[in-house]
C-alpha cells in the first residue's frame, strides 16, 4: 500500500479532484462510491465551495460504499450528509445519484442496491467495476460497514450485504470485498490518533482479522491511504511505499 500524509481535509479534497480530473480526460463518465463520516463531510464541502469550477461534476455518478438503514432525511444517513454538503450545493441531477433505500427493510434495500449496481456499472472480470471508491477505517479496523465480528461478510460473493453494528445492533447495507477489490482505484481516508495502532496492525500484521487486512488489490489498482498529519508523531509523517 502507498501512504500519503495530508495537512488537512482541503489538501485531501484537492488531491482527489486531481484524480477525478485525470480520469475524466480519458472517459466520459466517472463511477464513484463515497463514504460517510466527519472527514468526508469536510472534503465534500470543500469540493462544493472551492472546487465547484475545477471539474465537470455532471459527469460523475454517485453511489455509497455503505449506508445505515434509516430514512434519507435522518441525521445518521450518509446520503443525507452528502446531499447537504455536496450534491445540493453543486446542483447535481438526481438521475446521477444512486442511494441505498435505507427506509426499506434491510434485506430488500440490499437486494435492490446490488441490482442497481449490477445493472448500471461497467464490468471487469465479470464483476461491476467502480472507477474510484472512497473508504474510511474505524478504530476497530472496519471499513464500509464490514466489522471484525462479521469478517466473513467481506468474502461474500455478492456486491452488497446486510451488516450489523456490533454495539448498537443497527442494520446497514455495505459493499463487500468482492466489489471493493474490483475497483480501479481505492482511497482510504484515516484520521485520528485513536486509529494509529490499528493502522500499524493492518500494515504489518499478516494475521490481523480486520477487513482492511483482507484488502487484496490487483496491481493495476492504485491503493493509497491518505492520512491527516495528526495521526502519527511528526517524525513519521513522510510518504512511504
UniProtKB/Swiss-Prot annotation:
Keywords: Hydrolase. The keyword Membrane does not apply. Pfam families: Glucosamine_iso. One of its GO terms (biological process) is carbohydrate metabolic process. GO terms for molecular function: 6-phosphogluconolactonase activity. InterPro entries: 6-phosphogluconolactonase_DevB, Glc/Gal-6P_isomerase, NagB/RpiA_transferase-like, PGLS. Its EC number is 3.1.1.31. The keyword Hydrolase applies. It comes from the Bacteria. It catalyses: 6-phospho-D-glucono-1,5-lactone + H2O = 6-phospho-D-gluconate + H(+). Pathway: Carbohydrate degradation; pentose phosphate pathway; D-ribulose 5-phosphate from D-glucose 6-phosphate (oxidative stage): step 2/3. Belongs to the glucosamine/galactosamine-6-phosphate isomerase family. 6-phosphogluconolactonase subfamily. Hydrolysis of 6-phosphogluconolactone to 6-phosphogluconate. This is 6-phosphogluconolactonase. It comes from Treponema pallidum (strain Nichols).
Amino acid at each position: 500500500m502507498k501512504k500519503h500524509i495530508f495537512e488537512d481535509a482541503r489538501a485531501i479534497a484537492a488531491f482527489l479532484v486531481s484524480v477525478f480530473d485525470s480520469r475524466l480526460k480519458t472517459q466520459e463518465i466517472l463511477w464513484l462510491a463515497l463514504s460517510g463520516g466527519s472527514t468526508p463531510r469536510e472534503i465534500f464541502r470543500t469540493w462544493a465551495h472551492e472546487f465547484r469550477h475545477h471539474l465537470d461534476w455532471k459527469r460523475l455518478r454517485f453511489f455509497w460504499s455503505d449506508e445505515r438503514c434509516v430514512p434519507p432525511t435522518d441525521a445518521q444517513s450518509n446520503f443525507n450528509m452528502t446531499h447537504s454538503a455536496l450534491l445540493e450545493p453543486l446542483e447535481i441531477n438526481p438521475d446521477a445519484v444512486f442511494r441505498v433505500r435505507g427506509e426499506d427493510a434491510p434485506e430488500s434495500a440490499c437486494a435492490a442496491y446490488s441490482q442497481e449496481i449490477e445493472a448500471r456499472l461497467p464490468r471487469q472480470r465479470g464483476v461491476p467495476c467502480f472507477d474510484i471508491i472512497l473508504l474510511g477505517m474505524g478504530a476497530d479496523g472496519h471499513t464500509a460497514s464490514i466489522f471484525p465480528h462479521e469478517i466473513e461478510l467481506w468474502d461474500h460473493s455478492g456486491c452488497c450485504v446486510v451488516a450489523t453494528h456490533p454495539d448498537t445492533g443497527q442494520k446497514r447495507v455495505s459493499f463487500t470485498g468482492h466489489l471493493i477489490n474490483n475497483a480501479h482505484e481505492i482511497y482510504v481516508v484515516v484520521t485520528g490518533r485513536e486509529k494509529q495502532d490499528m493502522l500499524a496492525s493492518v500494515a504489518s500484521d499478516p494475521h490481523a482479522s480486520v477487513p482492511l487486512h483482507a484488502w487484496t488489490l490487483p496491481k493495476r489498482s492504485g491503493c493509497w491511504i491518505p492520512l491527516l498529519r495528526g495521526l502519527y508523531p511528526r517524525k513519521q509523517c513522510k510518504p512511504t511505499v
